[in-house]
Amino acid sequence: MKSIEKEERPWGRFFVIHDESNYKLKRIEVDPGERLSYQYHNRRSEVWTIVEGEAIVTIEGKVKEYKKGDTILIPKRAKHRIENGKQKKVVFIEVQLGSYFGEDDIVRIDDDYNRIQ
């Protein structure tokens, strides 16, 4: 897979596939037993499509399970998290839509890796 950026995180990794002024496209891999922080974004919404594995997604306190082929809409400022409770990695495609896509637009509410500022 060709990407323009790869970054390792405590929960797995992400690959930036495409980056434009009005959208950003990522492939995100969540390792078994890991989860992202419970977070929100002020300047972007996100659309996730699960392409591999099964995930547990929390949006505004509501928890739901998703599988390959499912799509999830995360509105701007909605608190959200994805987690992998299985033994195989979860892979999803994330489309970010908005006016700014910097990693500093992540406001963490809860984080297993002590990254709350």
Regions picked out by a protein language model, each given a short descriptive name:
Residues 3-40, 44:
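A short glycine-rich, His/Asp/Glu-containing loop-to-beta-strand
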Residues 2-8, 81, 85-117:
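Double-stranded beta-helix
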Residues 32-34, 43-44, 62, 78-79, ...:
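A generic "binding-loop/recognition-motif" signal
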Residues 37-38, 57-58, 74, 80-87, ...:
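Short beta-strand His + acidic residue motifs that chelate non-heme Fe in jelly-roll/DSBH
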Residues 43-56, 60-61:
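Glycine- and acidic-residue-biased ligand/ion/polar-headgroup-sensing regions
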Residues 36, 62-64, 105:
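Short beta-strand segments
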Residues 61-79:
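Short acidic-glycine-tyrosine-enriched beta hairpin
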